[in-house]
Amino acid sequence: MTLSTPPSSTRPSRRKFLQQSAVGTATVYGLSLERSAHAAGSAAIKIGMLGCGGRCSGAANYALSLGKDVKLAGMMDVFQDRMLEKRDFFRKEFPDQFIASDETCTSGLEGYKAVIEASDAVLIACASKYHVFYAEEAVKAGKHVFIEKPHAIDPAGCHRLRRLCELAKKKNVC
């Protein structure tokens, strides 16, 4: 039996495949987050953004579009102008779901604490070197975590994340 490759015109491009895979992953993530939050007895799912660039904003936009029970509780970015721009965007586009206060809309490197505290789930899409640190802080606080790729930038970070996954399982936030 000979397997042939379909002509390139019928094969999806690598870009198209990755886009469709990302949408599928986000959908599964959204469903599992919704189920776990509702199973815990909470009516609303509060999300927080660590990073206000295109990827984190896109993930937050998608999560908020899942339904009125998803609320944006906080956002942080190193650059204040970027955070303010996204804050204004989400306030306008999702007025009933934007519940972030001035204390949970922060800039700089220390603002992550207020965002994690205010959230049930944290979207991490910022400079890759901070992914592991922010994920550790969120899981230790008992929060669900979504991290953009790359999850870690070196082998030590990968090992820390692997151990963090075990902690997340114990805390039932995986």
Annotated model-derived regions:
Residues 114-133, 146, 153:
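Rossmann-like NAD(P)-binding element
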Residues 132-174:
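Beta-strand-loop-alpha-helix segment that lines the small-molecule cofactor/substrate pocket
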Residues 58, 81-85, 114, 130-134, ...:
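Extracytoplasmic/secreted proteins, especially bacterial periplasmic and envelope-associated proteins
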Residues 4-25:
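N-terminal secretory signal peptides and thylakoid transit peptides that target proteins
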Residues 94-124:
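A structured beta-alpha segment of the ubiquitous adenosine-cofactor-binding alpha/beta core
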Residues 43-45, 68-71, 119-122, 141-144, ...:
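Loop/turn elements at helix/coil->beta-strand transitions in domains of secreted/extracellular proteins
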Residues 24-95:
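N-terminal Rossmann-like dinucleotide-binding module
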